[in-house]
A protein has these predicted regions:
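Short, small-residue-biased leader/transition segments that mark boundaries at the very start
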Residues: 1-4
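S-adenosylmethionine/decaboxylated-SAM
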Residues: 7-172
């Protein structure tokens, strides 16, 4: 889940960037998307993807009843496969979906970001589990560890891991 502080922080990053196009991988309750939409420029849009179709009945009412519903496109589907088909260049991306596919989400985000755009990746400290050797059955922790190593060694980007709650990595 996303905390009030983290969502508020993300919204401020959007305001500072003067972002008008934002993509989110992993909607869950829609809270992050709503906070991001509040920080968008006039005419800006958040495209938020949730791969778990069973989440729709819970999430859609929160988004549709929010004061920024007109700035959010809630999409049930796989962002990794579907977002590039939009043909949109985004200012920012927020990765907070399946930890096992963070690297794929990251590569997709890079492919749809404008030059100088930002990626925010959530849960990159994963409650401290990234400091331990994961059990072979713990694919979520392994996914985050692999992502952290991948980004750390990616010379295409600048990055900083912020030790906010569960970890937030800012990538440009």
């Amino acid at each position: 889940y996303t905390t009030l502080f983290r969502s508020d922080f993300n919204g401020h990053i959007i305001e500072v960037q003067s972002a008008d196009g934002f993509i989110e991988v992993g909607t869950f309750s829609g809270y992050s998307a709503i906070c991001m939409a509040e920080g968008l420029e006039e005419g800006g849009m958040v495209y938020t993807y949730e791969i778990n179709d069973e989440q729709e009945d819970f999430t859609r009412p929160w988004i549709e009843n929010s004061p920024v519903a007109d700035k959010i496109r809630f999409i049930i589907g796989d962002a990794i496969k579907e977002a590039p088909k939009l043909g949109i260049e985004f200012d920012m991306a927020f990765i907070d979906g399946d930890k096992r596919t963070y690297i794929e989400s990251y590569e997709m985000a890079l492919s749809v970001l404008r030059p100088g755009g930002f990626i925010l990746a959530d849960n990159t400290l994963w409650d401290g589990h990234v400091l331990e050797v994961p059990k072979s059955s713990d694919r979520q922790t392994a996914g985050i560890e692999n992502f952290n190593d991948f980004v750390m060694n990616d010379s295409r980007v600048e990055k900083v891991l912020l030790p906010l709650r569960d970890g937030l990595t800012l990538i440009r």
